[in-house]
UniProtKB/Swiss-Prot annotation:
Septins are GTPases involved in cytokinesis that assemble early in the cell cycle as a patch at the incipient bud site and form a ring approximately 15 minutes before bud emergence, which transforms into an hour-glass shaped collar of cortical filaments that spans both sides of the mother-bud neck. This collar persists until just before cytokinesis, when it splits into two rings that occupy opposite sides of the neck. The septins at the bud neck serve as a structural scaffold that recruits different components involved in diverse processes at specific stages during the cell cycle. Changing K426R: Abolishes sumoylation in vitro. Belongs to the TRAFAC class TrmE-Era-EngA-EngB-Septin-like GTPase superfamily. Septin GTPase family. GO terms for biological process: actomyosin contractile ring assembly; cellular bud neck septin ring organization; cytoskeleton-dependent cytokinesis; division septum assembly; endoplasmic reticulum polarization; exit from mitosis; G1/S transition of mitotic cell cycle; mitotic actomyosin contractile ring assembly. It comes from Saccharomyces cerevisiae (strain ATCC 204508 / S288c) (Baker's yeast). Residues 30-37 are annotated as: G1 motif. There is a cross-link at K426, K437 (Glycyl lysine isopeptide (Lys-Gly) (interchain with G-Cter in SUMO)). The C-terminal extension (CTE) that contains a coiled coil is important for the recruitment of BNI5 and subsequent localization at the bud neck of MYO1. Residues 418-518 form a coiled coil. One of its GO terms (cellular component) is cellular bud neck. The keyword ATP-binding does not apply. This is Seventh homolog of septin 1.
């Protein structure tokens, strides 16, 4: 056997060290200031997540716990803001106090398990947990939090779409990573009253895509009676508004008495009440210090943190994954495939976008209407099969009839090769998607002449392209909205600067006028003092002459 055909020595070693283990994704959601960051650090028993306005100032990629290894540092995976800047990465600036932060979603990838470099015995590779922690920032800090629920729901739905597109491919990626969220912890503000409107809306929206566990934070701020009543209020609101949270239900057909007792105990603790802290004592435990003493956050008498850790990483980890896969994802998958398979042939009018990316040329129309009315946009949006009288209702008829074709020709001539290539690629993609959806229509798929293998191939090609096309359109629409909001904000700043400049000019004019008035008044006072001095001298002279005459 020749040397060239001999396999490398480390070939099997690489196969053995291939990534194995459990993939587990958790979402921490809730209003700002409820302790999500502190909980994440306490959950992993390390300080790798910085608090607000501390981003970039701490070593977020360094873990003090040998059992926790940061694979990918924290990154922004999605955000939506009226100001166009993610609040998570922005520094503290009092000048931005009047701006709404929007919502930012971050992701951190970690590896939980034994560290072989620490001299510990090698553990089973299947026990390693590849943990993805998703966190939300900015909820509850906006005048309108509807964009927060929409952004979180859109992110969760996108993860389902990615898995669905991968499953329907003929050739799958062997290194595909599942990013679906298996459990979401929703942090409730410790008001003592119950759920708020934003809590109900958010938990309802995300419960379609993941298991939701409500969490009460700062449990040490309640007495035992107050905490019991707060739990009852929350569960009453959950039943009243039909919020589908994850419940530890007891199966009457289950023969495992230990499991039944465990679920009963966990159901009585819902929602879990926890305490978090950034302070460690001399033994390395997380504690909270008070004037009257020190308490441990893992104390079962005052906090459910220890029980919650066991639920998340022990007893119910696989159940969360199974529920996400077999119930939530399957419902979404069947609904999505039905909508794609039953889609009729899409005409050219529905695939064309009605707006282009904003630019400085249409800045004025963007500020006033939020739409783009430039000649280039009109030429791009105009279709060959669109009658002229349909367009004349929105635009000036005489200008369009006289100059429409000329402007379109000029734009085609002046358009750069890059833009022309981009338009051609976009047109090809739209034609491809249109043809795929046509082939996936019921009339085409139910044809008796079509082989079964061809039907499966058409379905496998349809879903990924359709899902990707929908995501691209959603991203483009989002970018256009952000650009429009930024343009409006820029216009407001321009008007504010112009107003301040006008005020400065008026102030300068007033100061100059006061100076002139001051100089003229000083001259008048000097003249008056001179005249009075002359009168005084005259008086003295008259008195002297009178006195001399008497003598």
């Amino acid at each position: 056997m020749s040397t060239a055909s001999t396999p490398p020595i480390n070939l099997f070693r690489r196969k053995k060290e291939h990534k194995r283990g459990i993939t587990y994704t958790m979402l921490l959601c809730g209003p700002a200031g409820t302790g999500k960051t502190a909980f994440a650090n306490n959950l992993l028993e390390t300080k790798i997540f910085p608090h607000k306005y501390q981003y970039g100032k701490s070593n977020a990629s360094i873990s003090s716990n040998p059992e926790v290894k940061v694979i990918a540092p924290t990154k922004v995976v999605s955000f939506n803001s009226k100001n166009g800047i993610p609040s998570y990465v922005s520094e503290f600036d009092p000048m931005r106090a009047n701006l709404e932060p929007g919502i930012t979603i971050t992701s951190t990838s970690l590896e939980l398990g034994g560290n072989k470099d620490q001299g510990k015995p090698e553990m089973n590779e299947d026990d390693t947990v590849f943990f993805n922690l998703i966190m939300t920032h900015g909820i509850g800090e906006n005048l309108d939090d509807s964009l927060c629920s929409e952004e979180v729901m859109s992110y969760l739905e996108q993860q389902f779409d990615i898995v669905l597109a991968e499953e329907t491919r003929i050739k799958r990626n062997p290194r595909f990573e599942d990013t679906r969220v298996h459990v979401a912890l929703y942090f409730i503000e410790p008001t003592g009253h119950g759920l708020r409107e934003v809590d109900v809306e958010l938990m309802k929206s995300i419960s379609k895509y993941t298991n939701v566990l409500p969490i009460i934070t700062r449990a040490d701020s309640f007495t035992k009676e107050e905490l019991t009543q707060f739990r009852k209020n929350i569960m009453f609101d959950v039943e009243r508004y039909n919020v589908p949270i994850y419940k530890f239900e007891v199966d009457p057909e289950d023969d495992d008495l230990e499991s039944m007792e465990e679920n009963q105990a966990l159901a009585s603790l819902q929602p879990f009440a926890i305490i978090t802290s950034d302070t460690r004592d001399s033994e390395g435990r997380y504690v909270r210090e008070y004037p009257w003493g020190i308490i441990s956050i893992d104390d079962d008498k005052i906090s459910d943190l220890k029980v919650l850790k066991n639920v998340l990483f022990g007893s119910h980890l696989q159940e969360f994954k199974d529920t996400t896969q077999n119930l939530l994802y399957e419902n979404y998958r069947s609904e999505k495939l039905s909508s794609v398979a039953n889609a009729e042939e899409i005409g050219p009018n529905s695939t064309k976008r009605q707006s282009n990316a904003p630019s400085l040329s249409n800045f004025a129309s963007l500020i006033s209407t939020g739409q783009f009315n430039s000649s280039q946009t009109l030429a791009n949006n105009l279709r060959a099969d669109t009658p002229r009288n349909q367009v004349s209702g929105n635009f000036k008829e005489n200008e369009y009839e006289d100059n429409g074709e000329h402007d379109s020709a000029e734009n085609e001539q002046e358009m750069s090769p890059v833009r022309q290539l981009g338009r051609e690629i976009k047109q090809e993609n739209e034609n491809l998607i249109r043809s795929i959806k046509t082939e996936s229509s019921p009339k085409f798929l139910n044809s008796p002449d079509l082989p079964e293998r061809t039907k499966l191939r058409n379905i496998s090609e349809t879903v990924p392209y359709v899902l990707r096309h929908e995501r691209i359109l959603a991203r483009q629409q989002k970018l256009e909205e952000l650009e429009a909001q930024s343009a409006k904000e820029l216009q407001k700043r321009i008007q504010e600067l112009e107003r301040k400049a006008h005020e400065l000019k008026l102030r300068e004019k007033l100061i100059n006028q006061n100076k002139l008035n001051g100089s003229s008044s000083s001259i008048n006072s000097l003249q008056q003092s001179t005249r009075s001095q002359i009168k005084k001298n005259d008086t003295y002279t008259d008195l002297a002459s009178i006195a001399s005459g008497r003598d």
